[in-house]
């Protein structure tokens, strides 16, 4: 580990992560702008919501680190479900729960309440995958985490636009 500072400050676990190219912005269609036409939520819309979340350790987005990809987002608008699998940059990433919590909070703040969300680690990509997924799936733990003012501040930093 080397010194450095991301959102949480402190030491970096992955000092030299691979950086991926951002995908292009999705063009808005006339149908999407028409308020009279029902607009279902799809995987690209969810990806657009989470792609710019800041990594807690690096001055990069989750998309730039390939932590989130559109292919790992599943949506069923009729069933009101969203599933997002995310891949930490290293198998022992201690920030995995914070990253998952940031994704979950972004979705909670952005989507209609009818949606049920499943935010989880991509299978086989993290040493503590089961424990992290269990925490992220536990509504009471998530609510308690968001009552912690310091943790909420860190999540909000991950969700804020970088200048």
UniProtKB/Swiss-Prot annotation:
Q: Which GO terms describe its biological process?
A: chromosome segregation; protein maturation
Q: Which domain of life is it from?
A: Eukaryota
* Keywords (A to Z) from UniProt: Chromosome partition, Cytoplasm, Cytoskeleton, Nucleus
Q: Where is it located?
A: Nucleus; Cytoplasm, Cytoskeleton, Spindle; Midbody
One GO cellular-component annotation of the UniProt record comes to: cytosolic [4Fe-4S] assembly targeting complex
What the protein does comes down to: Component of the cytosolic iron-sulfur protein assembly (CIA) complex, a multiprotein complex that mediates the incorporation of iron-sulfur cluster into extramitochondrial Fe/S proteins. As a CIA complex component and in collaboration with CIAO1 and MMS19, binds to and facilitates the assembly of most cytosolic-nuclear Fe/S proteins. As part of the mitotic spindle-associated MMXD complex it plays a role in chromosome segregation, probably by facilitating iron-sulfur cluster assembly into ERCC2/XPD.
Q: Describe its partners and assembly state.
A: Component of the CIA complex. Component of the MMXD complex, which includes CIAO1, ERCC2, CIAO2B, MMS19 and SLC25A5. Interacts with CIAO1, ERCC2 and MMS19; the interactions are direct. Interacts with KIF4A; the interaction facilitates the transfer of Fe-S clusters to KIF4A to ensure proper localization of KIF4A to the mitotic machinery. Interacts with CCDC117; the interaction is direct.
Q: To which protein family does this belong?
A: Belongs to the MIP18 family.
This protein is called what?
A: Cytosolic iron-sulfur assembly component 2B
Q: Which organism is it from?
A: Homo sapiens
Which gene codes for it?
Answer: CIAO2B
């Amino acid at each position: 580990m080397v010194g450095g500072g991301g959102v949480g400050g402190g030491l970096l676990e992955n000092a030299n992560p691979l950086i991926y190219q951002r995908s292009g912005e999705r063009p808005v269609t006339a149908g999407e702008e028409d308020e009279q036409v029902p607009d279902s939520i799809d995987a690209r819309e969810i990806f657009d919501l989470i792609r710019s979340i800041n990594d807690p350790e690096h001055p990069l987005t989750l998309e730039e680190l390939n932590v989130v990809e559109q292919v790992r987002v599943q949506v069923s608008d009729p069933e009101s479900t969203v599933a997002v699998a995310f891949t930490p940059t290293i198998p022992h990433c201690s920030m995995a729960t914070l990253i998952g919590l940031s994704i979950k909070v972004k979705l909670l703040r952005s989507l209609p309440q009818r949606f049920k969300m499943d935010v989880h680690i991509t299978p086989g990509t993290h040493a503590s995958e089961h424990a992290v997924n269990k925490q992220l799936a536990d509504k009471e733990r998530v609510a308690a985490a968001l009552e912690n003012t310091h943790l909420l501040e860190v999540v909000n930093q991950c969700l804020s636009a970088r200048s």
